[in-house]
Amino acid sequence: MTEQTGKRMMRIETDRLIITDFTMDMAQAVHENSLDEDNRRFVPDEVFETLEEARETIEFLISVYGTNDGPQVHPVITRQDGKNIGYVQMVPMEDGTWEIGYHIAKAYTGNGYATEAVESFLPEMAGRVGISEVYGICLKENIASVHVLKKCGFEPVFEGTGDYQGEKRKIFRSVRKI
């Protein structure tokens, strides 16, 4: 628990990563990580064009920690050098289910960081929000994300045209029991 919020802090450590709570001093890294071409292509609603947008988003994310009212988004930090390389998240959906999400900055992709983050984050967050299954949804053309989901034990439940960030797109929807 933190003295300031009374909420239990997130701290997951793997061999290479630390998943923790956001702090306001992470805004610059969040802003920079959001601007890469893959983020713009696959999750355009998570691009922060200005440092102020990143600050406002972090402030909101911190405000929903410890609740089931909003996205539970946590930074992924490298243990070796303390770099903020992305995030992992659980997001409540309108139907009451939850979705996993993740983004690793382009300079750090291809190293298994997303898989490592998802594998360590899922059991902890599932316990916190009280669920026994979680969905993974991404664009079908996002081969790297499809690969991460499959590697993390998600089973396909739908591949085809569906709603993705307000547009009809070809999606890959999968589920994992926890």
Q: Each PLM stretch: what is its role?
A:
Residues 38-60, 72:
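Conserved GNAT-fold acetyl-CoA-binding loop/helix
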Residues 61-75:
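A short helix-loop-beta-strand connector motif used in the catalytic cores of GNAT acetyltransferases and
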Residues 1-41, 75-178:
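Acyl-donor (CoA/ACP) binding surface of acyl/acetyltransferases
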Residues 22, 50-52, 65, 168:
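A short hydrophobic/aromatic micro-motif that marks alpha-helical segments and, especially, helix-coil
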Residues 40, 49, 64-68, 159-160:
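Generic macromolecular interface patches on structured domains
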